[in-house]
Amino acid sequence: PDNQAIIIVGDVDVNHIENKIKELFSGIKVPANAAKIEPVEVADNDTAIYVIDKDKEQQYDIFNIFMKHPAIPNAMKGDMSYLMKGYMDNVVTSMLGARYAEIAQEADCPFLQAGADDGDFLLSSTKGAFSLIGVAKPGKVKEAYAAVLCEAKRMHDFGFTATEYQRAMEEFLSQVEKTLANKDKMKNEQFTTQYVD
């Protein structure tokens, strides 16, 4: 019980809900021999680790590439540097996503779509990952993989143009304004997700 939490969002009677939680859960005690909960460190690796699998229900060839990095410590979450990192991650993945969308318009592009993200490494709390995802055209998995990775390498080596940044920043600000304008229409699960993260 000491490694669990209850998150309640919505228009509720705080005193009533707090008393109900205490009534239901205050009697639960931590067992004397409870296992110690410790985060499991995810090791770094010098060479690629890959898995290839098939799913007869999956119509497309999809690939994910994870580039691990240290996770953001919980103590830093909520401060200004964390918010700035979130902004930078959003803008970088948006700019790279725009490049992938533009490339996908070319007739000889080997992928149907591609994108990038930066967040948790699978279920790990000790590692984050910059990740790329691609959906290959039929029979073009190797070419699609190479094209997606090549554009990410180009981003790493040469960065972005001022025009790309301006467009991404304007999109970000537009999203923020839209969220603010609709703040009274946010669903409870949106708040819950933010609290869990």
Predicted regions and their residues:
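Short linear motifs at secondary-structure transitions and domain/linker junctions
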Residues: 25-27, 37-43, 70, 88-91, ...
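Long, His/Glu/Asp-enriched segments that create or flank divalent metal/ion-associated functional microenvironments
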Residues: 63, 85, 89-93
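Long, highly charged amphipathic alpha-helices
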Residues: 16-23, 91, 95, 143-150
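Short C-terminal domain-edge/linker segments immediately following a structured domain
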Residues: 36-42, 82, 94-99, 162-167
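M16 family metallopeptidases and their MPP-like homologs
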Residues: 2-9, 59-80, 100-197
